[in-house]
Every structure is written in C-alpha cells, then in structure tokens.
Regions:
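Membrane-proximal intracellular helices of multi-pass ion channels
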Residues: 1-480
Length: 480
C-alpha cells in the first residue's frame, strides 16, 4: 500500500473542494447573504489539503487497484465531512448528523433530505447543496484526474473504483484523456439543459440548481413541491435530460465519433429504454382514473418513471398517493437504476441483464449438463472475472440492505414500508421513498443513529460497496 500517495491524493481532493466552494460563496455575495460559512470552510479545506499534500508527498505516484479503492473511499468521506461545515455554520442544519446526512446525500446524488422548509434557506446554501450533486455525479476523482497534472495515466483504477457499473474501461488509451472527455460531455449536457430551462422562463438560479440536480441524477429541489410548480415545458425538459444522464457516457463518445451503428446496437440502451417505456405505459393506465386525462396521466408517469429509474428523485406529484400497482412498479425501479457508466445509481441495467443471462445459462446447464454456456453482452463474450463479480455483488448487496433495514426497524415511529423504502432509496441513491419518507416528506424524523446509518448506506451504494469495504479492511493496510 502506497500510503503517501493515498493521503497526498486526499490532500489534493480537499484543496479541490475549497475551489468548489467558491461558487456558493459568489452566490451568497450576489444575494447579499453572509459569506462567512463558506470563507471559514474554504480556509479549513485549504489548510488541511495543503498540509496533507506536503507532508505525504510521494516519490512513486502510480496508483494501483488497492490505492484506487482506498483513495476513492476516503475521498468521499473527507468531502462529506468538510462539505457539511457550511450547513452547520450557516444555521441551516445546526445538528452535525443532519448536516452530514444532507452533504452525503448531495455528493452521492441521492437527494434524500432532512430540510423541512427548503424555500426559506439562503441561496448560497441551496447552491452548495445542489452543486454537490453535480460534483458527485460524474465523480470528484474523475474530475481530479482531468485537471491535476501530477496524476499519472496509470490511474484507470480510480475510474473503475468510482464510476458505477460492472464494466468500466477507457474511452481512449490514456486515463487522463478519458476523464477529460467524460467531463466535457458532462459540462456540455449540463449547459444545454440550463439554456433550455432558461428559455422556458425558469429563473437562472433555479435553472442552475435543477440542472446540477438532473446532471448528477441527484434530485435536490428548492421548492416544497420539487418540480411540480414549474411549467409543463420545464418538466418535459427535465424528463428528457434525466433520461439522457442515465445513459452510458461511452455512447455519447461513440456519437461524437459518428459511430452511430455501434450506438444504436447497444443492448443496454435498448433495455433501459424498454424498461422506461413499459413502466410508463403501465403506470399511465393505472393512474388514468385519478386524473381523467390521458395527457396528464402520461405526463406525470413519464416524469416519475424517468426520475426513479435514473435515481434522480425529482417529483411532480405525490406518487405515494397513487394506486398500489404504480407504487410497486416505482419501488421495483429503485433497484434497477440507469446504465453503467452513467451518473445514475441503482444496480445498473447491464448488471441486471447479466444476472438474467447467468440465470438462463444455469437453467440450460441443468437441462443439458454437457453444454458450455457463453454469456455475451453487446455482442462480446463477458469474461469470467466480470461474471464472478456480478454473482458476488448481488448477495452482498441484498445482505447490506437487509442489515440496514433491520437497524432502521428499531425506530419506534416508522413502519415497515417507510423503513424498507428508506433503505432501498438511500442505498440506491434515489432520495424519496414511500410512506413517511415519500416525495412530500423528509428524513428528519429519524434518530441521529439512523441518519448516520443511512448516510453510510448512501456511500456504500454510490461506491458500490467494495471501495469502502476494502478501505476499512485491516488486510488492505497490512504490509504483506
């Protein structure tokens, strides 16, 4: 373990967070709000970051798999601990556990909130809250790789540790170039959404906040009814961009190269769109009698399916009041998530596809014991290492969900439905759940212990368990 490289990178990341805090600082100044919470946090981040990068300056700057996992895990914890300081100092969330929960929810792009009166919060705080979505969406380590010259091109392990999904690789031979391409696509899509929303007469501040939330598939809103008070045009724009940010970013690179044949042959993309279409059709038919308008039912179901499938978490209606069939479909969509290599959370469409292909192979093998089954995805044979990883991930995934659910069951004021949906929603980085944590509710009623457990659930889900597991494992730090 190259410990110096680990802490050196943490120092650089903390310094980068100081730079990120300049945006909410400027917003606070523009709206004539006190800048002190951000100035103090920037000072703390700079001192800590510079100290770490100077004390632990490494001779060998190569990052291997072990270092990659540890850097990613510790970086996200450090970002959240420092990022919660403005919430505490501003008085928006004076309780540390509330502030930590909100910050983790932001960086992990979950969107679960403990704020009860979001419309009364300072603009600077709201901007920081949503900007954490944008930073966490593509991954702050990917951002660091894109801008810091000292990070070597053998750092693909950071990409693999931080980018969601079972298969992550390079778009181009150099990892640094891959990171830059990803962020250029990310910035372009975000800016495009801002322009479209402003054209729909959404105020610039609102457009920025909601574009950050859409891009990171996070879902923090600045209105009590989330997106419900905005025009139909703005809701449609956000629906489209939620779906776009749930697509594998490799496909956008193929589009830039005009390789449309490979783009439209993507099995994961068609499966993703198929799930969206089927779920939308079923929910539209199910809620039609509530609104007595096919157009209204289609608009609401389209938005909510896109929001839950991509794990964004915005809402235009209280879907917890919908019939049980619609609520059940949305609950199941919480597990699926978007495509691998997107900013969405959840299991990922490709991983679900591989699971069903593995099940089909085993069933065939039971009928034909001598057969040799080959699992293919996107027309290519999937190697055994990837298949083993998928097979191992599912039982671990459900074991963590079961454990977190049992801990939440100790809460006296929450029922099984609320606790289960809170667990699934936080672990899959969605935000709203059902019952007492539904789209018009918040997580503020949970105890400090439960909020901390749910914060860890969000981190585990965003990093897909293994980086945090490895970072806290004693064997990772042993010299053997």
């Amino acid at each position: 373990m190259n410990r110096k490289m680990v802490f050196y990178m943490i120092g650089k990341i903390v310094q980068a967070e100081a730079a990120m805090l300049l945006l909410p600082l400027v917003v606070a100044l523009l709206y004539k709000e006190t800048p002190l919470p951000f100035l103090i946090t920037i000072g703390i981040a700079l001192v800590l970051g510079i100290a770490l990068s100077l004390i632990f300056k490494p001779k060998d700057r190569v990052i291997y798999a072990k270092e990659g996992f540890v850097i990613v895990a510790f970086a996200w914890i450090a970002l959240s601990l420092i990022g919660c300081i403005p919430f505490v100092l501003s008085g928006a969330l004076p309780n540390f556990f509330d502030a930590f929960f909100e910050t983790v929810s932001g960086f992990t792009t979950t969107g679960a909130s403990v704020m009860t009166d979001v419309e009364s919060m300072p603009h600077g705080v709201l901007m920081w809250r949503s900007f954490t979505h944008w930073v966490g969406g593509m991954g702050v380590l990917v951002f660091i790789m894109a801008i810091i010259p000292s990070v070597t091109d053998r750092s693909i392990h950071i990409l693999r540790a931080e980018m969601p999904g079972p298969i992550v690789g390079k778009l181009v031979p150099r990892a640094k170039q891959t990171a830059r391409i990803l962020y250029l696509i990310y910035v372009f899509l975000t800016a495009t959404e801002v322009i479209f929303l402003v054209c729909g007469k959404m105020p610039l501040f609102d457009a920025l906040v909601h574009s950050f939330g859409t891009a990171g598939t996070g879902g923090f809103g600045i209105k009590a009814d989330s997106i419900g008070s905005y025009s139909t045009y703005c809701q449609v724009v956000i629906t489209i961009f939620m779906l776009l940010f749930g697509v594998n970013f490799n496909l956008y690179f193929l589009a830039l190269l005009r390789n449309f044949r490979s783009l439209f042959k993507s099995q994961e993309l068609w499966c993703y769109l198929g799930i969206f279409g089927v779920a939308t059709a079923l929910i539209t038919a199910n809620i039609y009698n509530l609104y007595h308008s096919l157009g209204k039912a289609l608009q609401l179901s389209t938005f909510q399916v896109a929001s839950i499938l991509t794990t964004t978490g915005f809402s235009t209606a209280d879907f917890d009041l919908w019939p049980d069939l619609s609520r059940s479909i949305l609950f199941l969509l919480m597990f699926v998530g978007g495509c691998a290599g997107s900013t969405a959370g959840g299991l990922k469409v490709s991983r679900v596809m591989l699971l069903f292909k593995l099940i089909r192979r085993e069933l065939r093998h039971m009928l034909h014991p001598r057969s040799v089954g080959v699992v293919k995805l996107e027309g290519k044979r999937v190697d055994n290492a990837t298949l083993n990883g998928v097979s191992a991930y599912f039982p671990i995934y459900f074991a963590f969900i079961a454990g977190i659910f049992l801990i939440l069951s100790l809460e006296p004021n929450f029922n099984i439905e609320s606790n289960l949906s809170a667990t699934v929603s936080c672990f899959n980085n969605i935000g709203p759940g059902l019952g007492l944590v539904g789209p018009v509710q918040s997580y503020t009623g949970y105890s400090n212990l439960s909020k901390f457990v749910l914060s860890m659930a969000m981190l585990l889900g965003r990093l897909e368990i293994f980086p945090l597991w490895f970072a806290l494992s004693p064997s990772t730090w042993s010299k053997k």
